[in-house]
Swiss-Prot record:
GO terms for biological process: glutamine catabolic process; pyridoxal phosphate biosynthetic process; pyridoxine metabolic process. Belongs to the glutaminase PdxT/SNO family. NCBIfam families: PLP_synth_Pdx2. This is Pyridoxal 5'-phosphate synthase subunit PdxT. It comes from the Bacteria. It comes from Roseiflexus castenholzii (strain DSM 13941 / HLO8). Keywords: Glutamine amidotransferase, Hydrolase, Lyase, Pyridoxal phosphate. L-glutamine binds at G46, E47, S48, R107, I136, R137. Pfam families: SNO (PF01174). PANTHER family: PYRIDOXAL 5'-PHOSPHATE SYNTHASE SUBUNIT SNO (PTHR31559), PYRIDOXAL 5'-PHOSPHATE SYNTHASE SUBUNIT SNO1-RELATED (PTHR31559:SF0). CDD domains: GATase1_PB. Its EC number is 4.3.3.6, 3.5.1.2. HAMAP family: PdxT (MF_01615). Gene3D superfamilies: 3.40.50.880.
Length: 189
């Protein structure tokens, strides 16, 4: 099973390294033809507006949507979660996006880069066990659709991880820790 990692911008190398550590073959995805060679895809953190523009420039938006509709598992971390959201609360209407998951993403929900933080929180998908979460200019997920399951919440109740069928979104960066559990969870989806 080859895991594609969108490699247009952002921290795709960290995801690639994590997957290599756990023995999963990877392929950097930059063009639509690369999608034919992967069974699942990770959209990394980075800058959502830039990644969205590059998705459009390289003709990846429609092929990606089609593969996800066919059942390919997809995981967006931070900026990737924003790009997967059907709605972006504070985004521009013309911002290129995948608009796949029935959630609203609120960008930079914690403020600027200076307000970045780490916290340990329980994750439903991991049997309620705690996971170290790194938040860097992170979004939160709001207005979850009926078929979207929240997987992790902050102490104030805001959702920071969710799943809808074959789609996983995390507002934090598991790839920036040494904990492999979220990557293993994605491989089992």
């Amino acid at each position: 099973m080859t895991v594609g990692i969108l490699a247009l911008q952002g921290d795709f190398r960290e995801h690639e390294e994590m997957l290599r550590r756990i023995g999963a073959p990877t392929l950097q995805v930059r063009l639509p033809k690369h999608l034919d060679r992967v069974e699942r895809l990770i959209i990394p953190g980075g800058e959502s507006t830039t990644i969205g523009k590059l998705l459009a420039m390289y003709g990846l938006i429609e092929p990606l949507r089609a593969r996800v509709r066919e059942g390919m598992p997809i995981w967006g971390t931070c900026a990737g979660a924003i790009l997967m959201a059907q709605r972006i609360a504070d985004g521009r209407a013309d911002q290129p996006s995948l608009r796949l998951m029935a959630v609203t993403a609120r960008r930079n929900a914690f403020g600027s880069q200076l307000e970045s933080f780490e916290i340990d929180l329980p994750v439903e998908a991991l049997g309620g066990e705690s996971l170290r979460m790194v938040f860097i200019r992170a979004p939160v997920l709001e207005d979850l659709g009926d078929d979207v399951t929240p997987l992790a919440r902050l102490e104030d109740g805001r959702v920071v991880a969710a799943r809808q069928a074959n789609m996983l979104a995390t507002c934090f960066h598991p790839e920036l820790t040494s904990d492999e559990r979220m990557h293993r969870y994605f491989l089992e989806m």
